[in-house]
């Protein structure tokens, strides 16, 4: 076994990748990610002690946030970047220890190895990485709970990073990241204590999504009902993918008046719903579908491509020289745009200059799709929605948020959407929408049957909408609403969304296309018995189950 990773839905055989990641990451990169996590656990241990002494280092918090984000599925495949991050982490950890001593603190004599181990060479890193991976925790249930917590923290870090880019942060979220990471080194914690920490992660998941919602809406306005073009124009263009709206804003400013159009891809589609971006005439529309189709769609786009966050798949040679990464994203041999300097826009001139020399996109479809149904927009038409429920025109809502992916079994979600009765409405967020957002599913009294709230973090909007409906209908429990949850997951942001929903009291969530490989039988049993978590079966049986047939 040259590596072990089971953090994503597509993990080999549903149990773990051991030679190379299904995502495309090499064993070297997987092991360095394990080592980076180990170093960050040591940083977290020291950070907790520093915080008790009133020492809060933003550089340390930012490093851990970005380090967690860099290890998310399909974010960074660059060996050299992880070697550099491990070195940076060790230096930050040791400077934090020096601050503790300077402030009169006494470092514990029995510090965990992650807080004291040090090395500098790539060879030493490789040796240590082999000792500190996931399987270093021998107890299957403890391992499962620790990894569930870590994957929740990774998703939390991603959302915190997006908010941070817009100038929004919350010290309590950073403090919990440290608490959670440090807890995964504590062998004295019982399974019940780890379960409690996992649920506490759900609380901070709600907090971080609320923070990001505030950051996005304060910066760019509240999403509104919007028709998005899916065709192309005959101009050179840049395709922007990922989730980072600040990067999009910088790119739109710099491309204005250059003759270069900008299109979104994948999870960047919901940017079109924000009022602030509608003033850009060269912001043309959305090109293509979910992340996993990029190997074909990046080819036919012809222009320059910018990856602001995950999801990146190992690029084909046919477009690799047109591809740029930024932020935590990386791939060996792909050009990387450095971080923005304080008070300045990020410099995308290299992307723009290349785009000018390239042909216009090849058209792959035409028409429009509709979205923008985040909480503020839905509240604006709340009377209509409530009346539709009271009159019986709408019998049930289906939350089908989450992720898309490569597996053929995900066609289930397309067929499920088609099979739902005409008196039902789908609430969605995340790239799971691409399984049904181009189907002609119609409307109910002018309300579209697919209401897209936005990116995966906008699952927060769906939770806010559910809580508002609970209030409007005078119910005691959110589970009394005519809402069913049939969620597709893929990576770690879906994990924090799930934990957030559990924290809010939502029960009977169906998760697919398979249950996470990192859930041990006993941990899965806890989730089933306490929260009603279930998998999916067939479209017909599941529709009948949800509709109470």
Swiss-Prot record:
CC cofactor: [4Fe-4S] cluster; hybrid [4Fe-2O-2S] cluster
Cofactor note: Binds 1 [4Fe-4S] cluster. Binds 1 hybrid [4Fe-2O-2S] cluster.
Positions where Cysteine persulfide occurs in the chain: 403
UniProt KW keywords: 4Fe-4S, Cytoplasm, Iron, Iron-sulfur, Metal-binding, Oxidoreductase
InterPro entries: HCP/CODH (IPR004137), Hydroxylam_reduct (IPR010048), Prismane-like_a/b-sand (IPR016099), Prismane-like_sf (IPR011254), Prismane_a-bundle (IPR016100)
Binding site for [4Fe-4S] cluster: 5, 8, 17, 23
First-listed, main subcellular location of the protein, grouped into a coarse class: cytoplasm
Compartments where located: Cytoplasm
GO biological process terms on file: response to hydrogen peroxide
GO cellular component, as recorded: cytoplasm
Catalytic activity, as annotated: A + NH4(+) + H2O = hydroxylamine + AH2 + H(+)
GO MF term list: 4 iron, 4 sulfur cluster binding; hydroxylamine reductase activity; metal ion binding; peroxidase activity
Residue numbers binding hybrid [4Fe-2O-2S] cluster: 243, 267, 311, 403, 431, 456, 491, 493
PANTHER family noted in UniProt: HYDROXYLAMINE REDUCTASE
Annotated function: Catalyzes the reduction of hydroxylamine to form NH(3) and H(2)O.
Homology family: Belongs to the HCP family.
Protein's recorded name: Hydroxylamine reductase
Organism of this sequence: Desulfitobacterium hafniense (strain Y51)
Higher taxonomy: Bacteria, Bacillati, Bacillota, Clostridia, Eubacteriales
